Amino acid sequence: MGEASRQQRAWNREMTVTTNLSLDIDKYPRDLLRGFMSENGGGRVFHGGETNCDDESTIELNLGLSLGGRFGVDKTPRKLKRSSSVLDTVPFNDSTVAEPENYTVGLERTTSLPAEMEEEWRKRKEMQSLRRMEAKRRRCEKQSFRVGNSDDQTVSFENERWVTASKSGFLQRHLVSSNRQVCGVDSDGGGATGGGSSSSLSELDNKNQQGSSNSCNDERSPKIVAGCSSNSGSQGTERPSVTRANKVNENENEKRVRSEDSVDRKGKGMATSTGLVDMPCVFTKGDGPNGRRVDGILYKYGKGEEVRIMCICHGSFLTPAEFVKHGGGGDVDRPLRHIVVNTSSSTF
């Protein structure tokens, strides 16, 4: 009885040690997936099969080497089972089949503007382009208008110079002197008056053919011719009446010239004392067979500007060489030496 009880106590002691070791091994499993699942706490561990296997396994009561920390456990009946992590990740087959999503949705305009805003934007762009074109057209018109005004001013300036020259005492002096000569010849005798009138008319015709101013001569020559013809026709009249008529005509001509000069000076401001002194009368006479005297006005010029002379007979601006050629002098090396300043002639 004593030996049996002793064996029973030893067997019970070994069983308690084995159970304690098995509990320690269960705390630290060799399966890594089981370790992760036990730490996360989300896995589902099935221990029912393990208990059955432990019950079925036979425990050997010997002092052999332990395998994996367990003594006397036969590992042969153990089977590798699917881990709980695999069960969690693999989805279960569902009987209800989900309908596929319909991706054929109508295309929407995302990048471009809506139709109304795009139309307004297009209209705004068109208005801006029209405004730009209008501004450009106005700019071009202003520039062309300025260029036209400058050309008109130069032409009008030259015309005004020509008008002042034609209305000056230079031309009137020649006309009045010719009238005096005609009238003096009329007072001497009838035949002489006839010859004088014809000679004066021929001189006037020659001057007109040489390019004298049409405006001035057309206005004044008919009156002079009419006066001369009337004087030549009246052969039996007395000398005092002729002299009175001549004086009246001279006074009228002088008054007309003075009034025109005063109007020209007031309206246009062309005649100033300094400007008139700076523009003296000049003339040249050609040496060739076609040489003739040509009168002109030396136009005022500054430093570095070209010298210009206004021809009285045509009213055109010429260089000194052209002015000498106009008088029939030909090509000369120094044309200014062939141009003489007329100091005796009265200024404007």
Swiss-Prot record:
GO terms for biological process: response to abscisic acid; response to water deprivation; signal transduction. Forms a homodimer and heterodimer with AFP1 and AFP3. Interacts with ABI5/DPBF1, DPBF2, AREB3/DPBF3, EEL/DPBF4, ABF1, ABF3/DPBF5 and ABF4/AREB2. Acts as a negative regulator of abscisic acid (ABA) response during germination through the ubiquitin-mediated proteolysis of ABI5/DPBF1. It comes from Arabidopsis thaliana. Residues 247-267 have a biased composition (Basic and acidic residues). Residues 187-197 have a biased composition (Gly residues). PANTHER family: AFP HOMOLOG 2, NINJA-FAMILY PROTEIN AFP2. GO terms for cellular component: nucleus. Belongs to the Ninja family. This is Ninja-family protein AFP2. InterPro entries: Ninja_fam (IPR031307), Ninja_motif (IPR012463), NLS_NINJA_AFP-like (IPR032310), TDBD (IPR032308). Induction: Up-regulated by abscisic acid (ABA), glucose and salt.
